[in-house]
Amino acid sequence: MTNIRKTHPLMKIVNNAFIDLPAPSNISSWWNFGSLLGVCLILQILTGLFLAMHYTSDTTTAFSSVTHICRDVNYGWIIRYMHANGASMFFICLFMHVGRGLYYGSYTFLETWNIGVILLFATMATAFMGYVLPWGQMSFWGATVITNLLSAIPYIGTNLVEWIWGGFSVDKATLTRFFAFHFILPFIIAALAMVHLLFLHETGSNNPTGITSDTDKIPFHPYYTIKDILGALLLILALMLLVLFAPDLLGDPDNYTPANPLNTPPHIKPEWYFLFAYAILRSIPNKLGGVLALVLSILILVLVPTLHTSKQRSMMFRPISQCVFWILVADLLTLTWIGGQPVEHPYIIIGQLASIMYFLLILVLMPVASTIENNLLKW
């Protein structure tokens, strides 16, 4: 008798994706982040669902409802902080996952990579709208500043912003629609993640060498199931350490002040995971230019496969490219730091230099380094 998992229409899909899937024998812990992102997404959907049971998306009661969740709802505080810090863990995993893709040349799987970029945009949109929901000072002003950027679009800008706001400022209508979008987007992300996986399983996973691993495959279960479980346990450990010992470490104190349209906070800044993009936005003195740079800072990932000039796929055996890659990582950390600093000397010039470096590294130095390496190897 054939095993039910190989014959049942539904079980067959699960089997081919998570049990009998042929996987490379040498994939390192950098390949754990895909499954960790899945764990993060499930965790965010579950905690978010329970928060939505008690949250009210009305400007007069939103802030109070979040306070009510933390004070009066059974274990409401832990659900709220798991959701808030879960977003940080989500983005840590996302950045690691994208970094892994860049380093090991996984972007040559074009469909998988492009859907990944769409997933990144969708996750950033979800996180932004979620940050608005508690209706604190930083929620309100963050929403005002970021939505206002769309007014830089020529001709239709102002109308577009007022259409998104549902009025002439960020108000009741804005909060309600942001809640609706924040609720629906994670399910769209889950669907896109399945498509992401579908395209990945068309080609099979890449591996650290970048060389085809068709001659050396092992079954996903039990080897990588146990590895993923270990990764998930470590992720949950890190998350719970954050939640139970330093729940407000990554948050902004200004968000504990209810939203007040008449009082602007001294420093408007987003959550830490958007600071690199925020620094790029601020480094350009022109509004439209800043918005374009902001969008391009993420959209540039779509260009990476076309900029791949190396004869090798992975950076494992390419020391010059490795140097460029780690300089890029350092540059992104610099941008993250600058994004959280006030707009004054010397931060302005550092931000501008780091922004120029960011685009220069990806568009020029990466392909140049690859070409140099090809020539050194006489390829």
UniProtKB/Swiss-Prot annotation:
Gene Ontology process terms (BP): mitochondrial electron transport, ubiquinol to cytochrome c
Extra remark beyond the main annotation: Heme 1 (or BL or b562) is low-potential and absorbs at about 562 nm, and heme 2 (or BH or b566) is high-potential and absorbs at about 566 nm.
Cofactor needs: heme b
Keywords: Electron transport, Heme, Iron, Membrane, Metal-binding, Mitochondrion, Mitochondrion inner membrane, Respiratory chain, Transmembrane, Transmembrane helix, Transport, Ubiquinone
Residues that hold heme b b566 according to the record: 97, 196
Residues annotated to bind heme b b562: 83, 182
The protein's name in its UniProt record: Cytochrome b
Primary localization: mitochondrion
Protein source organism: Oryx gazella
Disulfide bonds: none
UniProt entry tagged with the keyword Membrane: yes
PANTHER family hit by this protein: CYTOCHROME B (PTHR19271:SF16)
Gene Ontology MF term list: metal ion binding; ubiquinol-cytochrome-c reductase activity
Subunit structure: The cytochrome bc1 complex contains 11 subunits: 3 respiratory subunits (MT-CYB, CYC1 and UQCRFS1), 2 core proteins (UQCRC1 and UQCRC2) and 6 low-molecular weight proteins (UQCRH/QCR6, UQCRB/QCR7, UQCRQ/QCR8, UQCR10/QCR9, UQCR11/QCR10 and a cleavage product of UQCRFS1). This cytochrome bc1 complex then forms a dimer.
Topological type in the membrane: Multi-pass membrane protein
